[in-house]
Amino acid sequence: MSTLADTIHIENVVASSDLGQELALDQLSTDLPGAEYNPEDFPGVVYRLQEPKSATLIFRSGKVVCTGAKSVDDVHEALGIVFGDIRELGIDVTSNPPIEVQNIVSSASLEQSLNLNAIAIGLGLEQIEYEPEQFPGLVYRLDDPDVVVLLFGSGKLVITGGQNPDEAEQALAHVQDRLTELGLLD
């Protein structure tokens, strides 16, 4: 039997790390195959990997941000590859720079249509924003876990702000429980 938790899919994981030294981005972008650097448009080097599919932003300060990965494991694998590629250029990268997950964006479904007006009234104005003229989704800010859930009339949800994949499951369970309490879910 499938559960609503089975509808959760990680769409994007963003993580950061630090190489611990300043980098010459002009040289780095020349030496890293496929790297892009247009300082007039963006202050960092964009280094894309096909496997795992991701983009790593490398800044002069040595800070790096990996985005586009579909799992926390993929982020670690991607940054491991990036660190290895940078080491091969003769740049000293510590063996295991700490990697910190900043944001996980997940999608999920309640598998039924939602009356967002009724939900906005039921949940109260303290934790929600709903202005359908501005944005078609209802923004629901949770405290535990500390995430934001976007609810759409289709029953689809986007859960963002988490730093652990389990937080999406906790958020979905919370939303399901609250809407059931309010009599707004079948």
Swiss-Prot record:
Taxonomic superkingdom: Archaea
Annotated disulfide bonds: none
Keyword Magnesium: no
Single biological process term from Gene Ontology: DNA-templated transcription initiation
Molecular functions per Gene Ontology: DNA binding; DNA-binding transcription factor activity; general transcription initiation factor activity
Keywords recorded for this protein, A-Z: DNA-binding, Plasmid, Repeat, Transcription, Transcription regulation
Coiled coil: none
Entry-linked InterPro entries: TBP, TBP_archaea, TBP_CS, TBP_dom_sf
Repeat positions for Sequence: 10-86, 101-179
Classification via NCBIfam families: PRK00394.1-2, PRK00394.1-5, PRK00394.2-2
Family of this protein: Belongs to the TBP family.
Main function: General factor that plays a role in the activation of archaeal genes transcribed by RNA polymerase. Binds specifically to the TATA box promoter element which lies close to the position of transcription initiation.
Name of the protein described by the UniProt record: TATA-box-binding protein B
Organism: Halobacterium salinarum (strain ATCC 700922 / JCM 11081 / NRC-1)
Gene name as annotated: tbpB1
